[in-house]
Amino acid sequence: MAWFSWQQAKQLDPSLNALDGFFASPPVKVQTVTGGLTNRCWRLESSEGLAYVWRPTSNVCKAFAISRHNEYQVLNAIAPLNLGPKPVFVHEQGLLVEWVPGETLTKPGIDIEELLPIAARIHEYPATAVPLVPFSYLSRIDHYWLELRCQYVGTEYEALYQKWRSEPSVTQVPAELCHFDLGCYNLVRGEEGVKVIDWEYAGLADPRLDLTLILQLADVPIELGVEQYCRIRGIEDVALWSEGVRAWMPRTQMMAMLWYLLAYKLWDDEQYLDSAREFKDLLCMEDHCFDNS
C-alpha cells in the first residue's frame, strides 16, 4: 500500500473531499488498498486511531452497476450478524466502512467446511430485513453487454451471451441475501473469526446462483459442495439444489466472461482478456455451446 498525505490523496481522488465534514481533523494516515479488482479504495486512520476504508463511487461502479447506497443498506441490515464491516458514513461520492483487521485469506487458508457455513449464515438472514430490489440476472448481463458498446458483435462472445441470456427453467426457491463474490480474497481472519468484506455486488436472488459462484471460486465439485451446503442448512431436497446449481453454472460463467471483457475495456490489462477467453473456452469445452436447458 502506498502512503499519502490527506491533501495529496484528495488531489488524486476528489471523492475524498466528501469526508471533510465527517472527520473533525484530517486523517493522519492515508493509504491505497490493494487487492480489489473493481475499484481503488483508501485506508484512512483518524487522529483518534480509528481505521476506516473509503469505497468511492466512480465510473467503474457505474460500469459494473454497483451502488454504494445499496452496499450501505446491506451492511446496515446485516449488522446483527457481526459478519461484515460496520458502515459508518454514506455519500453520493462513496461509502465509509470500518477497517476489518486481520489476514486476507488465500485458498489454502480456508476450506469448504469453514466457507459453506459462512455462506449459509448469509443466505439464511431474513430477506425482508434487507431493503433492496431483487437482483435481476437478465438486467445485469444486459448492462454488461451494453457497456461493451457493440465491441464484440458477431463474435463467439456475443453467441454465448445470446445463448445464455435467460434464467434457467428450474423449480424456484425463495430469494435470499447473496454476496455474489464470496471468494477467499474477500474473507479476513481476525480475532473475532472470519469476516466478509466487499459487499458491493450483494443482492437478493436465488441462493443457488450464489452457491454456484462460491463453488466455482473455491474449485469444489458441484455434488460435494451442494451436499455439504444442504447438510449445513438442513435442506432435504438436495436434488432441487443440485439441479439449480448445474443450471446456473453456464450462466455464471457467461456473466463472468462479460465481466472480464468489461474489465479489459476499462483497464486495458491483457490478463482480463485472458480470463474472458478462459470462460469462453470453458463454456464450449463443457458442451454448454450445444445445450441450453
Set out the residue ranges of the language-model regions.
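Glycine-rich, phosphate-binding/catalytic loops in enzymes
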Residues: E71, K195, T212-I214, D274
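Start-of-helix signal in alpha-solenoid helical-repeat scaffolds, especially tetratricopeptide repeats
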Residues: E243, A247-P250
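ATP-binding pocket architecture of kinase catalytic cores
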Residues: T32-F135, T155
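Active-site acidic catalytic loop and adjacent metal/ATP-binding pocket
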Residues: T34-S46, L50-W54, R165-L209
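A general structural signal marking secondary-structure boundaries and capping sites
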Residues: N82, I122-A129, P168, R233, ...
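ATP/Mg2+ or Mg2+-diphosphate-binding catalytic cores
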Residues: W3-F4, T155, L258-S293
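An alpha-helical support segment within catalytic cores of ATP-dependent transferases
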Residues: Q8-P26, A127-F180, G190, D237, ...
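Active-site activation/catalytic loop segments of kinase-like enzymes and analogous catalytic loops
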Residues: R208-D237, P250-W267, K280-L282
